[in-house]
Amino acid sequence: MHSDIEISRQHTCLPITDIANNLGLEPDELSLCGANKAKISLSVAKRLADRENAKLVIVTAVTPTPFGEGKTVTTIGLTQAMNLNGIKACACIRQPSMGPVFGTKGGAAGGGYAQVVPMEELNLHLTGDIHAVSSAHNLAAAAIDARLFHETRLGAEAFTQESGLTALNIDAENILWRRVVDHNERSLRQIKVGFGAVNGPVHESGFDITAASELMAILALSQDLKDLRQRIGRLVLALNNQGEPITAETLGVAGAMTVIMADAIEPTLMQTLSGDPCFIHAGPFANIAHGNSSIIADTIAAKLADVVVTEAGFGSDMGFEKFSNIKVRESGYAPSASVVVVTLKALKANSGIESDQDINQPDTQRLKVGFANLEWHINNVSQYGVPVVVAINRFPTDTDEELEWLKQAIEQTKAFGSEISEAFGKGAEGATKLADMVYRATQTPSDFNLLYESNTSLESKLMTLAEVGYGASSVTLSDKAKSQLNWLAKHNYGELPICVAKTPMSISHDPDIKGIPTGFELPITELRLNAGAGFVTALVGKVMTMPGLGIKPGYLNVDINDDGEIVGLA
């Protein structure tokens, strides 16, 4: 079988104007970005406001493994198959970050014959939204440091006289706004800036990956341009010497930041290998951010299609939990069905049983022990009141016997049902049975509910997430987190939802604990306010908001030939 990029390159794309026309978009609602991409105007949702929303399907998975479970493959394959079955479907996915593209994970266009094309355009730059987020974010960092420099240089009174601005009295030890870059760069996690006589007071800072920027979350959670502007204004960049928040609005930089991101608020339309529509918009990671594509993309797709298929990052304890308790809480657009993706490899890897045997070979013991992880995720999604369909993503090495055992085992769970998907190797034709089952699930009663109410305390929300969301017995807070919790309560941020940043490789905080961890304490090391996005991030265990490159990163395989064709992109 050809590589993903070879399959993408061998395919002749339809004009993106044809994709838009088939979806029901008007010519003046498109801003073309070459032949294969178009920005979509937010006016679409207004034009079709009276139209009933499509059924929403959310794709999640079991606890991730290094082998990959195939959420995006399933999301795209399901969309392709629904359209083949005569159901008008549209996919909504996140924009890939170049950090993972050149790191270990690779791109995020799907794979095989279930991918968004051209995959190299999707995985590299797309329409520049991530760059806009980076630029707007780093403008705020430059602005707060410049203000600190001038106020320190002149003193508060002289600064006000010379500038006509009120001194903010920034506490250099409490500048909360870090910088971002769209690459994995561990050496920038903790830095000091301001060295040199004319470069401002020295203070600690650091870089996060752009996908972890609060601006990326704001882009994903905003309803329109006005909402984007208001949210950016609420960003808390630093504290003053009295411990009070200094916002982007107070600093006077919110308007300029919004201008940089004005085009980024429009979703990008591309197509699958079958010529089906796919919106790509926003790219927050699910382990260190809220892990879902934008509300705006969903809102537009909901007025154009009969079914919208979107995905949440990593396992259901990560992206799906945040989809439910953060994204749906904001949008009010609840799912009618969910899909939990699983592979035989994932179950064996999640068994926690050490074995020298090739994981591609039959192994009944590991499969049966690892099944508990799948059942946990089925139960986890079910508690939100959404029908669960299990998509068994088939690999060529899978045996019929193990697949049949798995299907029978799933029949004894709370799942609506299960189907084997071969979308990777067969495209739409490989997922028609799955598409039929998922569509039937969307037609059954769904009683979606949130895990906690907004009016409960942050401490109560943390306990609920720990105990009900992860199976922990208790929560422990570091001294730093306790102090931050008190500050948040004092400044009336207690009703915000929680975004837990933790390892995705275990339901717990420890990536080495497989299966279904129980009886553990969830250690909260830090609480970060995201006043603009509208949530509080709780950092758990040893999680990092800036990844690092591995010993053999993906960029080693990437090059360009004499004809200008990219090679080695995964």
Curated annotation (Swiss-Prot):
GO terms for molecular function: ATP binding; formate-tetrahydrofolate ligase activity. It catalyses: (6S)-5,6,7,8-tetrahydrofolate + formate + ATP = (6R)-10-formyltetrahydrofolate + ADP + phosphate. GO terms for biological process: tetrahydrofolate interconversion. Belongs to the formate--tetrahydrofolate ligase family. Keywords: ATP-binding, Ligase, Nucleotide-binding, One-carbon metabolism. It is an enzyme of class 6 (ligase). Its EC number is 6.3.4.3. Pathway: One-carbon metabolism; tetrahydrofolate interconversion. This is Formate--tetrahydrofolate ligase. ATP binds at T65, P66, F67, G68, E69, G70, K71, T72.
